[in-house]
Structures are given as C-alpha cells and as structure tokens.
Amino acid sequence: MNENTSLWIQRFLPLIAVGGSVLDLACGKGRHALLLAELGYRVEAVDRDAQSLAEIAARAPGIVTRLADLEGGSWPYHARAFDGIVVTNYLFRPLLPLLLKALDEYGVLIYETFMVGNERFGKPANPAFLLRPDELLDVVRSRLTVVAFEQGEVSVPRPAMVQRLCATRRRDPRLP
C-alpha cells in the first residue's frame, strides 16, 4: 500500500465488493484511485483539475477519469450507483445527499475530512470546509448502517482535526 494513502481508507476498503465499482470523489492527485485500481476495483476518479486527471490516466489507463466542477456544475452521477465511494479532505455539503443516493444496494461510503477546530492547525480554516461535531454521523444515521465513526485531533500525517466515517447500506455489515 502507498504510504500516502489514508490508513482509514485502507482499513475499510475490504468492505467494498471485490472488483466493485468505486468513485473517488475530488480525487486530487489520485492516491486512493490508484490504490483502488491496483487492488482490482473498477475506479472512476472525478476532480476539477485536468492536469491531475491526465496524470492519473497515464499511470493507470484502466481508471475512468472525469473532469467536473462538483461545486458549480451539475452532479454527473444521477444515473449511476457505486459499490463504494471514497472521499478524503473534501467537503461540499450539497453533495452529501447525492453521495448517499449514488451508493449501490450494498454500497460502502468511506469518508475522511476536516472538522471544526482545524483552524488552529492551518488550512482549511473556513467553516464552509469544516464539518461540525457529529455532522457526518447525523447525515447518514437514518439511511446507512454506521460501521465506524471517529472525530477529533490527529497527529498523522500532520496535526489536524478530522472526522471519519465508514457506513454501508448493508444492515449486517462485516467488520474489516
């Protein structure tokens, strides 16, 4: 596994169906998309950075890349359902309900991003990009089964305040 990939993401990937379809939302440089492809998942990586997407496609031609403005454009996945959705270090609240709708029958959502309190460590500091306490939990609680949830201060890979969640449509999830 790549040392740059999130340990939280690595921990819960086994819950996604082997060879399943996975969306890496706001994928950035593709650290998780590349890992997913390496593990045999069918990956779609979406981001607004064309250069990063081109680099991902060059490194792993099997990854479907999509250039999209997730905050200013329309949601490109209305007709799609994924076995897994991975989101790290990204928050645009209007997408949260759309992510839940984009999960397949037994889909798994693995989410990790910054929360209130992170401003003391640097960026992001804008409240629009910081989850409130228990916010991810509150969003999914009535629609998914929560496998794991954490929030608080971390020191690795750098000091930050984060919120992490893994949830699934399965009512009887197996633990990794």
Residue ranges and their predicted role:
Residues 2-19:
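Conserved alpha-helix/loop element of class I SAM-dependent methyltransferases that forms part
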Residues 49-51:
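Conserved SAM/SAH-binding beta-strand->alpha-helix loop
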Residues 56-57:
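Conserved SAM-binding loop
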Residues 154-176:
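Core SAM-dependent methyltransferase catalytic element
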Residues 106-115:
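Conserved beta-strand signature within the Rossmann-like core of class I S-adenosyl-L-methionine
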Residues 20-28:
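Conserved class I S-adenosyl-L-methionine
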Residues 61-73:
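Conserved SAM-binding strand-loop segment of SAM-dependent methyltransferases
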Residues 75-84:
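A short acidic, Gly/Pro-enriched loop at the edge of an enzyme's catalytic core
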